[in-house]
Structure formats: C-alpha cells, structure tokens
C-alpha cells in the first residue's frame, strides 16, 4: 500500500502542473459581398502589426475606468497576428476573387499588390462596442496599381458578453476591414 502511494504521489503532482484547459476562440472573418472591378489579381497580405495587448494570447476587454483586462479562462486559438492576417486574406479572397495569400508570397511570379495593416486598437470597449482602428497601406512591387495609405476606424456592436461575443465582434470588424480594403483597391 505504501509503495503504491509513493508511486502515485509524483503522478498527482504532474497532473496538477499540467497546462490549463482554457477555452480557445478562433479568429475569422465573416463572409461578405463581392466587390467588382478589382484591378489586382493577386494580393500578398503581410503579417498584421498589433499593439502588445492585442498580440497576447489572452482575450482582453475594457473594464471600468478604461483599463484593459484579460477575460478569465479565455484565449485566442491562434497567434492573434497570424489569425487576423489569415482571416483578412480569406476575406479579401472571398470579396474580390483575387488570389490573396499570407506572406511570404507562395508563387514564383510576385503579387500585383502587397497589403500592410497596422492596428492601433483592437478590443471590446466597456460601452458594448468593439473598436478596430489603425491604417492599411497598399503597395505595388511592379508599379501596376496606384499605391496609397488609408486610416480605418471600425466600430461594431458586441452582441452579448464574454469572450465569444468579443470573438464574434472581431470577426465582423475584420469583415468590414476586408470590405474597406477591397473598395479602396
């Protein structure tokens, strides 16, 4: 009996030290309507630049007094920068019909345009609105299209509370960003 307890004690300690089983939420872009007359057939989407709180794996929301707090027991299922970049590429592909891919560009022939997105804010505000703000730049390595930089200030309602509502709001905000980029190109 003592021998069995001696063997089980280290196993119990290892189980207690195991990783937590936090809920993980996917980053996606809601589907949207197609944009006609896009001059670019190929789009390289560079890794989205995020502020440190938005690049962390924890999902954050604004609390009383304006401070940002991690929503307990909830994390993004993917690295937020990579997840937002992939969602934006999927959204652009669906909206434009252009071949949109995350950097590095996977084909031998270079892309018609490169999209660089820099996010200033990405969080669920205390007033029930999700804010996604920053700027995007479209560059043309071969000079085939006009290059430009545009700000974006996207506000979408957060329907409900908690991390799933914040994840849904981010999805809709990314879909709106894909729409704005598509129309600008």
How should these model regions be labeled?
Residues 1-17:
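Sec-dependent bacterial lipoprotein signal peptides
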Residues 17-80:
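A structural "domain/chain start" motif
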Residues 18-36, 90, 95-142, 159-160:
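Surface-exposed short loop/turn segments
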Residues 42-48, 60, 114-118, 131-137, ...:
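Soluble periplasmic/extracytoplasmic beta-strand elements of cell-envelope proteins
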Residues 67-77, 142-183:
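Short secondary-structure boundary motifs at beta->alpha junctions and helix caps
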């Amino acid at each position: 009996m003592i021998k069995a307890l001696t063997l089980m004690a280290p196993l119990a300690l290892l189980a207690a030290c195991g990783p937590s089983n936090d809920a993980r939420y996917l980053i996606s872009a809601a589907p949207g309507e197609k944009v006609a007359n896009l001059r670019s057939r190929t789009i390289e989407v560079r890794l989205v630049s995020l502020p440190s709180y938005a690049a962390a794996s924890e999902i954050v929301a604004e609390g009383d007094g304006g401070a940002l707090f991690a929503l307990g027991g909830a994390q993004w299922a993917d690295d937020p920068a990579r997840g937002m970049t992939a969602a934006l590429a999927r959204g652009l592909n669906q909206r434009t019909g252009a071949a949109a891919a995350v950097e590095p560009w996977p084909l031998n022939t270079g892309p018609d345009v490169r999209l660089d997105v820099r996010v200033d804010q990405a969080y669920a505000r205390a007033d029930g609105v999700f804010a996604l703000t920053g700027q995007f730049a479209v560059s043309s390595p071969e000079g085939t299209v006009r290059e430009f930089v545009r700000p974006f200030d996207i506000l979408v309602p957060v329907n409900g509370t908690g991390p799933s509502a914040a994840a849904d709001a981010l999805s809709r905000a990314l879909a709106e960003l894909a729409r704005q980029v598509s129309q600008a190109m």
